[in-house]
Amino acid sequence: MGRDRISELPDGLLNHILMYLHIEESIRTSVLSSRWRKLWLKVPGLDVNVHDFPADGNLFESLMDKFLEVNRGRLQNFKLNYESNLYYLMDRFVPWIATVVDRGIQHLDVTATDCPPWTIDFMPANICKSKTLVSLKLVNVGLDTPKFVVSLPCLKIMHLEDIFYSPLIAENLISGCPVLEDLTIVRNHEDFLNFLRVMSQTLKNFRLTFDWGMGSNDFSVEIDAPGLKYMSFRDSQSDRIVVKNLSSLVKIDLDTEFNLKFGLGSPLEPEDLTKRDIIRDFLTGISSVKHMIISHPTLEVLYRYSKIGQLPKFHNLYHLQAVFSSSLLQLLPAFLEICPNLKNLILDYSISAEPEQIDFTNLPRCLISTLEYVEIKQLTMREESGIKLVKYFLENSAVLKKLTLSFIDSPMTNQESEIYMQLLTSTKRSRGCHVLIL
């Protein structure tokens, strides 16, 4: 009979292993032997979902009480997923969270689901003064402004999603994290946070998603982060967007309309100086970026802005991924003109119902000297604007090394592929360009 080498491991190592098992599997190990009976109660972390337990809540309540009674040491991880409208447990969740925070939790993850606003649980105030928290994720819960100065000296990662904020708490949380490196804020409902200021000397990664359905002019965002390297900015609501000190920015994923709605015609008129200046200052503030992903709604804003103002230069930009419809192709040469050192270009192409006349006479500097790799996705065989787009790069890109084309009506017949290849090879300016059709 083989030796039970697992049971020979020290308790500390076994506890660490049990922490990565599902809670039910961890509990089952208690029947292995008397030594294993209470090992699961001493794991340094717990990942529990109320939905994995009987609906009456008795077993879950008993498990939590026993775990916290036996395990009085410092916890590494505590992840809790629950419904705050479970009336039989509604008074227990917040005290449990407060207890693990008091015991020196390092990684706290709390998600409340299916919670109408009147059942929202406001998190315990001691979260805002934890000396041990390294990462904090809160989803669909409330945050109240504490009566003390927020201080989270070890917090590096913070994720706040669909939070019901009291005034100033978001700004106080961010300013109270002197080593914060990674911040995510997601807002999909109305709250009291009309102004969001992100000021941090240490922040490296920032993601903002704001997609609440009702338009308003009352929302503002201000970002001041001199060490920021990556920003994902997906905001369809904020009217005023201010960025400062982003000279370290390497990559941006941009999807914003500056709260401009074009469905009933463009509200961006020459006399709208305030909105024009907001857009200009934002673009100037991110102009040192090297890698950009930009959405179709944002390009539409820039297209309309380009008719009343000058787009700033992006001298450092070498990689661009953009969503261009055939109606926006008129902007493409002008947009490439502000990227004089562009090396890689990915275009997600789509066909508009009423494409504008395309004028490809302008020859941007990057086509002559730097652009080496172009990929165009979602082309359609025999669609005129798409063919013009492909020929524009082939006929004018002097140093192009590779052009990759993918079609939504693939696979093409051999005859179609041969016809397309003949068209492409006969118009190449760069003799070393390799054309790949997917």
Swiss-Prot record:
What keywords are annotated for this sequence in UniProt?
Leucine-rich repeat, Repeat
| Domain (FBD) ranges | 355-407
The UniProt entry, under SMART domains, shows: FBD (SM00579)
Instruction: Enumerate the spans annotated as F-box domain.
Output: 3-49
Q: Does the keyword Transcription apply?
A: no
Start and end residues of the LRR repeats are 246-275, 286-310
Q: What is this protein called?
A: Putative F-box/FBD/LRR-repeat protein At5g44950
Give the organism the record lists: Arabidopsis thaliana
Q: Provide the organism lineage as a comma list.
A: Eukaryota, Viridiplantae, Streptophyta, Embryophyta, Tracheophyta
